[in-house]
Amino acid sequence: KRTLLCCSRWQGLLLLDLNTGKCRRPPFDCGKEIMNVLIDSQKRIWVAPYNGGLNCLTHDGKLLATYTTHNSSLSNNVVLSLAEREGEIWIGTDGGGINILDPETGHFSLLEHVPGSDNYSLPANSILCLYNDYNNNIWAGSIRNGLISIREVSMKTYTDLPATTAD
């Protein structure tokens, strides 16, 4: 069945039937203000409700875990972006940097901006977009400080736009 799970900042989760183009609600409710959603390699559904941390659900919507600043080491409850890399969930937050969650242990690691440190420091702590490419590099789009390439041994920030010429 060709169905796409989508999220909307104001309409919550939606299932889009790619054959008919019709949307319907999933059989479970996660609220209306959903910032991001990810289905990982284990078919778990990760849902980021606005200012609600991160929820992990089974494919049929049963709640497996909830991570917030109150019950875990998540650095910020406003989760803007999600990606998976080698079984870990990368979590871009609005002001809390990038949290890396091992779903098996519940342990968080943190990548953040450290003032005065260029090595292994993010240029900013608000991460709008995360993407894991085919070479297993994470690309992070910050809100005001450029595009960040995160590799196993290095990090590079791109802030300058290439010059454009009029045709």
Question: Residue locations for each model-derived region?
Answer:
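Carboxylate-rich, polar loop motifs that coordinate divalent cations or form catalytic acidic clusters
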Residues: 1-167
